[in-house]
Amino acid sequence: MVQVQVEFLGGLDVIFSKQRKHQVSVEGANGSVTVGDLIDYIVSNMIQKQKDVSVFLEDNTIRPGILTLINDTDWELEGEKEYVLEDGDIVSFTSTLHGG
């Protein structure tokens, strides 16, 4: 189990009880905990309304237009869903799509 900080920015906080920062404890299936495990946890435990899952996910991964950072580094450079989380990591999701 790891404890990480998860941030929802750029308006994403609306589907997470209007709270931007969350401290979460996540368990992994085989001992280590990946960002994929974190995403599963978020969908199962943190999104209040099932209809809002499509705002966050598309084709079982983070929706295009949402910048995902692990400790301020683009998750694409860290292995995306395969990145193994450690205690104290900060994972942020920022919507880059805004109304005007």
Swiss-Prot record:
Q: Give all 1-thioglycine modified positions.
A: G100
Task: Quote the gene name from the UniProt entry.
Answer: URM1
Compartment annotation: Cytoplasm
- Which keywords does this chain's UniProt record carry? Cytoplasm, Isopeptide bond, tRNA processing, Ubl conjugation pathway
UniProt organism field? Eremothecium gossypii (strain ATCC 10895 / CBS 109.51 / FGSC 9923 / NRRL Y-1056) (Yeast)
Q: What does the UniProt function comment say about this protein?
A: Acts as a sulfur carrier required for 2-thiolation of mcm(5)S(2)U at tRNA wobble positions of cytosolic tRNA(Lys), tRNA(Glu) and tRNA(Gln). Serves as sulfur donor in tRNA 2-thiolation reaction by being thiocarboxylated (-COSH) at its C-terminus by the MOCS3 homolog UBA4. The sulfur is then transferred to tRNA to form 2-thiolation of mcm(5)S(2)U. Prior mcm(5) tRNA modification by the elongator complex is required for 2-thiolation. Also acts as a ubiquitin-like protein (UBL) that is covalently conjugated via an isopeptide bond to lysine residues of target proteins such as AHP1.
Family annotation (PANTHER family): RURM1 PROTEIN
Question: Could you tell me what this protein is called?
Answer: Ubiquitin-related modifier 1
Pathway given in the UniProt record = tRNA modification; 5-methoxycarbonylmethyl-2-thiouridine-tRNA biosynthesis
Query: According to the lineage, what is the superkingdom?
Result: Eukaryota
Tell me which InterPro entries the record gives.
Beta-grasp_dom_sf, Mopterin_synth/thiamin_S_b, Urm1
Query: Which family would the database say this protein is a member of?
Result: Belongs to the URM1 family.
A GO molecular-function descriptor:
protein tag activity
Instruction: Tell me the residues linked by Glycyl lysine isopeptide (Gly-Lys) (interchain with K-? in acceptor proteins).
Output: G100
Question: What post-translational changes are documented for it?
Answer: C-terminal thiocarboxylation occurs in 2 steps, it is first acyl-adenylated (-COAMP) via the hesA/moeB/thiF part of UBA4, then thiocarboxylated (-COSH) via the rhodanese domain of UBA4.
Q: Offer one example of a GO biological process linked to this entry.
A: cell budding
Q: Which GO terms describe its cellular component?
A: cytosol; nucleus
Please give the Pfam families that the UniProt record associates with this protein. Answer: Urm1
